[in-house]
């Protein structure tokens, strides 16, 4: 049954169950909705139910949608049935700018079924319910909540703050290893074709919502603002990036690259040897880390919005784009290029990363 505030509920395309579009709707649906959702998703038996919501709080952050952390109780405790939950909504009904990114989560929801198959090679938060309504762009995802700093899991690390993270190179090695395992498993054909076929190659889809390209006048204003910022805060940027020569070249190159956006996307899509299913935004803040008895650092990944087949240069850049400049170069050289043989493969990986970076940032620079 649709909730009491109908504009906050939609009927899902996958299960045909009405689900809330935001935290207000979820709170109104309460334990009844959670019971129905977990049953229809197959994680809760008909003889079991959600009996209590012990914790319910909104979580700030992220570029799209609203988020909730919850703790629930069940009538019967069952192994593998999680009580600490994290809820993601694609919509932000109170913020039109954030709501524009609502399409980002559709692949995330479709990814739920694939992530549960035994052949899936890396750790992801276990999905207890996921559905979407394509027509309105409304999606909902309920997963286990990863408790950072508890039971062997390291604390949460923020992107762009590598200097606060112990052994950053080891962490990026673990992160890139996870990406490589997923890409390799997909290309080997070990994942169910019926599920991977739901993620066709679409280079243009790897972005947060629909961002309108900047006009030449607006782009020129951005460059002027950037130059003023560099002049005012020179210590915040590496010396070579803040030099007048670099800024002049940037002002000349970015419009030219943006003009060839479709050519760049075509080149990324055409290089079939480097295409695979992968995480598009595997920054360090979308990962969690732990060590096993072998003392090897392991990595799990969350926030699978825009997941799909892509050029691996895009995936690697998505993982490294928040790293310190020197760490980015070191991690790519150590973990990607020095492991490639022959050298032509290493060169191709570097080229793909550069093209992926250009295609991501030059068409719609922040």
Language-model features, listed with the residues they occupy:
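Conserved NTP-binding catalytic cores of kinases and kinase-like/nucleotidyltransferase enzymes
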Residues: 1-140, 259-262, 266, 290-299
């Amino acid at each position: 049954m649709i909730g009491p505030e109908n504009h906050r509920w939609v009927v899902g395309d996958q299960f045909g169950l009405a689900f809330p579009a935001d935290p207000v709707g979820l709170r109104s649906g309460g334990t009844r909705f959670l019971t129905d959702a977990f049953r229809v998703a197959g994680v809760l038996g008909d003889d079991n139910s959600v009996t209590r919501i012990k914790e319910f709080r909104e979580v700030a952050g992220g570029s799209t949608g609203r988020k909730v952390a919850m703790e629930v109780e069940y009538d019967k405790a069952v192994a593998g049935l999680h009580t600490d939950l994290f809820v993601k909504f694609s919509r932000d009904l109170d913020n039109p700018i954030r709501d524009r990114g609502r399409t980002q989560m559709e692949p995330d929801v479709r990814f739920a079924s694939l992530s549960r198959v035994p052949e899936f090679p890396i750790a992801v938060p276990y999905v207890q319910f996921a559905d979407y309504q394509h027509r309105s762009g409304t999606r909902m995802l309920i997963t286990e909540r990863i408790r950072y700093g508890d039971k062997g899991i390291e604390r949460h690390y923020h992107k762009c703050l590598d200097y606060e993270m112990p052994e950053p190179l080891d962490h990026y090695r673990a992160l890139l290893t996870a990406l490589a395992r997923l890409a390799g498993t997909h290309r080997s054909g070990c994942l169910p074709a019926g599920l991977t076929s739901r993620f066709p190659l679409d280079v243009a889809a790897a972005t947060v919502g629909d961002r309108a390209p900047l006009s030449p006048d607006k782009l020129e204003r951005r460059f002027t603002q950037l130059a003023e910022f560099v002049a005012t805060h020179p210590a915040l940027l590496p010396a070579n990036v803040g030099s007048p020569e670099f800024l002049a070249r940037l002002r000349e190159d970015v419009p030219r690259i943006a003009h060839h956006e479709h050519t760049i996307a075509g080149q990324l899509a055409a290089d079939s040897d480097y295409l695979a299913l992968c995480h598009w935004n595997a920054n360090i803040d979308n990962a969690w880390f732990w060590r096993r008895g072998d003392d090897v650092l392991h990595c799990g990944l969350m926030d699978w919005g825009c997941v799909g087949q892509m050029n691996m240069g895009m995936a690697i850049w998505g993982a490294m784009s928040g790293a310190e400049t020197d760490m980015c170069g070191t991690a790519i050289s150590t973990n990607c290029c020095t492991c490639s043989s022959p050298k032509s493969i290493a060169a191709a990986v570097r080229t793909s990363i550069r093209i992926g970076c250009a295609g991501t940032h030059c068409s719609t620079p922040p």
